[in-house]
Amino acid sequence: MMTDLESRVSRKLMLRIIPFVMLLYFVSFLDRVNVGFAALTMNKAIGLSPTAFGLGGGLFFIGYFLFEVPSNLILHKVGARRWIARVMVSWGIVSLASAFVVGPNSFYALHFLLGVAEAGFFPGIILYLSLWFPTRQRAVAAAWFMAAAPISGAIMKLPPIAGLADWQMLYILEALPAVILGFFVLKYLTDTPSKAQWLAPEERDWLIAKLKTEADARQSHAGHTAGALSALRDPRVLALALIYFGTSADLYTLGL
């Protein structure tokens, strides 16, 4: 059973962090799948064949795959809060530029760049959650965060505004929140529990001690710091990767 102090800290973490990161992931997933909705009118407008459209959609994941690990290596250097903000602003700008594609080549380039820009966001948030939530609450926190993805599929048809087609307005109106939220991340999120002024001193001290105890226990159990190549050979990592592959395939199939 949770102690009263543990219960208070858990409640504050859930209320302060989870709704906000859910909003970030909602916007993230919206920007990924909006191409499927935009295609209803965009393909004809810019002369995009179904094959070219499929290739452009695939290029997003190539950029995402190639730059996800480098992005997370940088994230560890500069901190999750700053890097998440950078990711959101850059993908918002690229998504905004997608409203002005004129043909297959610009469509290909921008969707590849969108994957590059967005690489590292999801694992960056997972890392951020691990800096705040003890092991006991971490799975619940991650589950709430991931619940934002399927919700983002509900999009209404947007009317043309100021001479722009509806698919252009879709890109613009879904890109702007990413840019705005990217800057807001810097103000709202706190780097580490030691800097959390929204926790009472005793709550902050308990959380820091709890996370340190768990980290020391993991380090003692592991006996060494495993590198990326060692992780890729771990059957548990491969099994989790396969599970995530299946989950992502389902979500993107429904979204697109």
Where are these regions (language model features)?
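Short hydrophobic/alpha-helical segments at membrane-entry points of transmembrane helices
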Residues: 103-111, 238-240
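Helix-breaking motifs and short loop linkers at transmembrane-helix boundaries and internal kinks
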Residues: 47, 79, 100-106, 117, ...
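Cytoplasmic helix-loop-helix junction between adjacent transmembrane helices
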Residues: 110-147
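Conserved MFS/SLC helix-loop-helix module at the cytosolic interface between two early adjacent transmembrane helices
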Residues: 66-105
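Central cavity-lining transmembrane alpha-helices of secondary-active solute carriers
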Residues: 57-73, 124
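Helix-loop-helix hairpin linking two adjacent transmembrane segments in secondary transporters
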Residues: 145-196
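Extracytoplasmic
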Residues: 16-50, 156, 254-256
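Extracytoplasmic gate region of multi-pass secondary transporters
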Residues: 35-36, 229-256
